[in-house]
């Protein structure tokens, strides 16, 4: 069947003809007589397929290309893998590893310039297991002389999913044990997303950021001052020790409560010493007297007397007397010697004959020709002889007598009589009589 059409294109062996139906048909060329735009007649059997045909040898290659495109489209349309945790590796180069739920590395970022140098040298890290990538980072840091013997590897894990923390911790501990055998220190710690964000803003790794913050906190918080046992001991020693000397004398209070009225009136009497009377009050006193009588009462006092009579009263006192009469009485002791008597001590009383000495706390001396009253809070009565009183004592004497009482005092008297009363005193007297009585004798 013959068809007609207008020649639209002329090729070497064929021509393209436009049919009245608007179709383009390629048919064999007949000689060189046809021209473009000329209407020609052609047979349908001579018509060539106008569809595009692929050569036979290209068909396998085209099939491979088609498969590649399909695979590319498939992976392209897949959703991006989710990051479940970050692990910061800080040596001097700092890098951050992003891992999936099964701890595959899907991203690796450098946190500083040294980290970028290491990252450029790392190859084939993507989709590798976390342990393998960390080993690669440590090895490359050793090769580049970043990791030396005086440095350590700090691993900081930040898990988005709390369920992943035990798995991360297990991997980190295995790495720590592995590198301990290689004499490389590996430290592991966990952190939070907020700390990671602060580290990113500071441009450093998370582990380095935590270390710097800890150092700042230590510098701000002042160390607690440890208690110095030496200073505490000095403070305890500086406090007044409770001793029998400091404890208020309750016995004196009791004595005052039950004292007779005449004794109370006698204690109120305060007499000023005459020209020949001298009183010295203080601890550790030393007195020397050359006269008729001497009394030595005071703590740790020493007295020498060359007269007729001497009385030495006090604690642990020693007396020597070579005179007419001497009485020495300690605490609670009583001495009675004929016409003359001296009684010195706490709460002691001595009364005999014409002469009497009464020395002690709250003690009183009796009126007579001679009287001595020595002790705390004691009073001496008017007489021919003198009574010597210790701490806080009052003494009245209108005779040729002298009282020397007190700590650390030194007095000298040249007269008829001298009284010195105290603790631990030593006296020597060369006269007519000597009496020495110690405590509780």
Curated annotation (Swiss-Prot):
Q: What induces it?
A: Part of the sigI-rsgI operon, which is induced by heat shock.
Where do Low complexity bias regions lie? 240-251, 282-328, 336-358, 366-408
Upper classification of the organism: Bacteria, Bacillati, Bacillota, Bacilli, Bacillales
Note the InterPro entries from the entry. Anti-sigma_RsgI_N, RsgI_M
Q: Which PROSITE patterns match?
A: RSGI_N (PS51849)
Locations of Polar residues compositional bias? 219-230, 411-428
Residues that span the membrane, as ranges:
54-76
Where is it predominantly found?
membrane
Region entry Disordered: which residue ranges? 213-441
Extract one GO cellular component term from the record.
Answer: plasma membrane
**Residue ranges annotated for the RsgI N-terminal anti-sigma domain, each copy included:** 3-51
Summarize subunit and interaction data from the UniProt record for this chain. Answer: Interacts (via RsgI N-terminal anti-sigma domain) with SigI.
User: Could you tell me where this protein is found in the cell?
Assistant: Cell membrane
Protein name as catalogued: Anti-sigma-I factor RsgI
Segments in the Cytoplasmic topological domain: 1-53
Q: PANTHER family in the record, alphabetically?
A: COL_CUTICLE_N DOMAIN-CONTAINING PROTEIN (PTHR24637:SF417), COLLAGEN (PTHR24637)
Origin species, per record, is Bacillus anthracis
Q: This protein's superkingdom? A: Bacteria
Alphabetized, the UniProt keywords read: Cell membrane, Membrane, Stress response, Transmembrane, Transmembrane helix
